[in-house]
């Protein structure tokens, strides 16, 4: 009986250690200026500046890949605050392998609500992406 308990405890503890992933350095993340800041037209045809205002990353080892979690803060700024409006935002995150070939892509589109009298609105959006080891990530808005 004692031997059975020891075997059970060993299996339980060894399986728990396999669940925890190893945290590693994240691959290179790049956003070209043309893809990091854009001026778009709102639904009511008013120009609105959209820009990336921060990125947080968390990466873990996943065999041949890196599992990358991103939190991207997008800021919308407008001058005309007299009306409520919606602004279209399109975010693309692309992982590339070492040969610069597309490995995985995640595109996300939404309408950012601009409340009356609100000049600046921030929104954080989460992504999860697989990146091959030795690869990199490109980030852009349009």
Give the ranges of each region predicted by the language model.
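Extended low-complexity, serine/threonine- and proline-enriched intrinsically disordered segments
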Residues: 87-98, 141
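C-terminal motif of bacterial Sec signal peptides marking the signal peptidase cleavage site
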Residues: 14-15
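Post-signal-peptide N-terminal segment of Sec-exported extracytoplasmic proteins
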Residues: 35-66
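Short, solvent-exposed beta-strand/turn "edge" segments of beta-rich domains on protein surfaces
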Residues: 56-69, 78-85, 130
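Predominantly extracellular/luminal regions of secreted and cell-surface proteins
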Residues: 24-40
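Short, solvent-exposed, Trp/other aromatic-anchored flexible loops in extracytoplasmic proteins
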Residues: 107-135
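Short, surface-exposed ligand- or partner-binding patches at beta-edge/loop junctions that are enriched
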Residues: 88, 131-142
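Sec-dependent signal peptide recognition
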Residues: 2-10
């Amino acid at each position: 009986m004692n031997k059975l308990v020891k075997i059970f405890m060993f299996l339980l503890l060894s399986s728990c250690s396999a669940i925890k992933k190893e945290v590693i350095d994240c691959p290179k993340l790049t956003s070209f200026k043309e893809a990091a800041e854009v001026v778009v037209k709102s639904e009511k045809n008013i120009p609105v500046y959209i820009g990336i205002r921060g990125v947080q990353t968390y990466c873990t080892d996943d065999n041949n890949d890196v599992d990358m979690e991103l939190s991207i803060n997008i800021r919308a700024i407008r001058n005309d605050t007299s009306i409520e409006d919606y602004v279209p935002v399109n975010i693309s995150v692309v992982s590339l392998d070492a040969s610069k070939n597309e490995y995985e892509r995640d595109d996300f589109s939404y309408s950012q609500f601009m409340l009356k009298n609100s000049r600046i609105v921030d929104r954080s959006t989460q992504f999860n992406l697989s990146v091959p080891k030795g690869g990199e990530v490109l980030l852009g808005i349009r």
